[in-house]
């Protein structure tokens, strides 16, 4: 006698099992290795189960489990809440066999791997031979082993739709729906509302105006900010005057944090746009490779930007934070981390400008432009940095977005003396230190608008504005077309690269360095400066800088 697995999931005794050799049967009896063990090693594996048998079991004991899929997925029996009812257990990581009886049958006779026909059809589909070959089956089980699945804390979500009969020729997007969902975040407008006594999140797509909003109820898993933090925030005063930019940086987010948790946490302070940073779009092949590695299309950066509708919401968010070492922190939870402190970095409007304490005048001809400034850098921090290298600074202005008043990563600095201005232009670079940021940025002359030629003062160009500015430390002047040719086109062709003088023009908010002159069709090669006057240009700039009060200039009157 031998124990066999009955269709109902029970064990029964039967006649001696006959081993098969092709289509011929032998009368040799096969001894069972189970000896009463409920987990018997039999010659019947999952590869031999027909789809009709699984379908009948689904109809009897798993009704409704596959209603959303249209067809029955055999793995749903393996991922059921109580798989012992079916005589099959969880998948074993260390073997190709996928039932628990082989895993625990230490004293039983485990059938060798070669006894199983790797190309034997197990499902009634056209591509069954290719779908269930052992190599692909092993690859699939290895993928399960590398996922978040474990025997002690079993989660059936990663197992669903993973080993279905037709799943071996689909993309990884369909094999790993949970990975894709957690890795790709979309920008959403979130507002928390109270409907029928319950709190809901109204989620809308800012790019789909006609799309109806989506509502998500705030249950136990999505509590957002604790009530104590909200109560403490309400007790603190709110200024009637704007104090912060409506755009806030959030750093240190857990990698596995969900969109819903971020919505619930920061939506508690008011209507907000969640702006997730993204990678550039990749092609399909690159995206498939990233999904194979377990990553999604969103860069794993750990930060997000918040754009609140009202500035008051930012003040409430700051009041709810803990202040530690000049930084604001707020607690946020994820599936793997509870109450993690994430950094909240608001931008104060008072940090946009810096003015020197003395009453020295601000000369715009001594202004430089600095790009690539770290966003947390305040105007006073940049002023101290430049004063330590080149000389006293009278004004610093951080370039901001006109609507949100958030830094754009650039600044304008005006020096108190012409000597400090020339030293900064000659130095070209400065190391900006702010907190943990340390960045080397370039210093360029700030090209202004509506400036007359410094050589002819408009007499030779009919008083038109000068289109060119020379940023070389020996020039630092505005030139009309005629004066540029007269002062820069020399006869010496052996000039070094650092001695070359290129024209700079201002177009809108951008300053460009031209490699050829627009008014000369054949182009030009920069040459050393050729001045007919005995006084050097630098000397004239230094003398002029102490008394000139000219206004900014930038965009030339010509279109190039």
Swiss-Prot record:
CDD domains hit by this protein: Bbox1, RRM1_CPEB2_like, RRM2_CPEB2_like
Q: Where is the region Disordered?
A: 1-43
Could you tell me the Gene Ontology terms of the biological process aspect for this record? cell differentiation; meiotic cell cycle; negative regulation of cytoplasmic translation; regulation of translation; spermatogenesis
Sorted alphabetically, the Gene Ontology cellular component annotations on this record are:
cytoplasm; neuron projection; nucleus; synapse
The protein's matches in Pfam families, at most eight in alphabetical order, are given as: CEBP_ZZ, RRM_7
Q: Which GO terms describe its molecular function?
A: mRNA 3'-UTR binding; mRNA regulatory element binding translation repressor activity; ribosome binding; translation factor activity, RNA binding
InterPro entries recorded: CEBP_ZZ, CEBP_ZZ_sf, CPEB, Nucleotide-bd_a/b_plait_sf, RBD_domain_sf, RRM_dom
Query: Can you give the residue ranges of the RRM domain?
Result: 246-349, 366-437
Q: Which UniProt keywords apply?
A: Developmental protein, Differentiation, Repeat, RNA-binding, Spermatogenesis
Asked if the Swiss-Prot or TrEMBL record annotates the protein with the keyword Nucleotide-binding, the reply is: no
Q: PROSITE patterns per the record?
A: RRM
Q: What does this protein do?
A: Cytoplasmic polyadenylation element binding protein that binds to and regulates the translation of specific mRNAs. Essential for progression through meiosis. Involved in spermatogenesis.
Tell me, how does this one assemble? Interacts with fbf-1.
Q: What protein am I looking at? A: Cytoplasmic polyadenylation element-binding protein 1
Which gene name does the record give?
cpb-1
